[in-house]
Amino acid sequence: MSYRNQAIFLGEMVMVEPGSPLLAFSDHVAELVERTAGTIVAVHGGGRWPSSGIHWRSGVIVTAEEVLERDDNIKLTLPGGRVADASLAGRDPTTDVAVLRFQPDGLPVATTADARLRVGQVVLAMGNHDGEPLAAFGIVALAGGAWHSIRGGTIDSLIRLDLALSPAAEGGALVDLQGRVIGMTVLGPRRRALSIPSSTIDRAVDQLLARGGVFRGYLGAGLQPMKQERASNESQASGNQRGVLVVRIDPDGPSARAGMLVGDIVTAWNGKPIERVREVMRLLGPESIGSTVDLGLIRGGASTALRVVIGERPVA
């Protein structure tokens, strides 16, 4: 190997000569970390350890809802170590976004962007560990379309990251190589690192600041999947239709007013087949409030239908 090469390998050691592209890239990443770190705070919200948050708008911190275990006595550790009080403006479990208010006192606001990510794109996960910057380097492992969380929230794109995300960095920033905050990092199933895109965050922030909560459609019925044996019997009795079982009716709720009964099986929503509880949760988004829905049912082995006006309730 020629000594004129920019990277010289000695066993497991890599020596990078001054002026090499690799060294320039390393310096650029370090500069991005330094520049972004001033907009990231540590959030003390009652968990086993602090998480992170992003100064999204002036006086507004965005963090991961799932790690915020209390609604009051929330503290922030700002870059440099200063501690500030924060109050909860609202939380949305369906998108994993919580919004805090605080006195910024000159703390810079993150530069955010709604970026279209590609698999293989290099990104940084930025957090705050008791006032000190925390960073992880990796790539976008999966870039998919819109999806629905288990709580029924709409996430504008599915972004999975190939990087090691510290629990202390959850709720922190996903940063591109232009220094823009393009999402919030969270830990998903099997502790995989995911990102909530900035467009989803902006939508949640607008609603939380305006109303203090995220309101969703309200059916007023408790649903659960049918056991396999019962599902098979009901399917045979109703032409192989599947559905979800009604196990509770809220008094004076939309379903009660429409005449739904415990033991009914919901098989369709405006003609669309229903087989899982999650499908109903997805359909009860904010846009469903006030709408009239035709539900297909099985009652006593016979098919019937009900018309229900969807109500409104805040997400708990």
Feature-to-residue mapping (PLM):
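PDZ/PDZ-like domain micro-motif
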Residues: 168-174, 227-238, 250-268, 283
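Short loop/turn microsegments at loop-to-beta-strand junctions
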Residues: 49-51, 169-171, 244-247, 261-262, ...
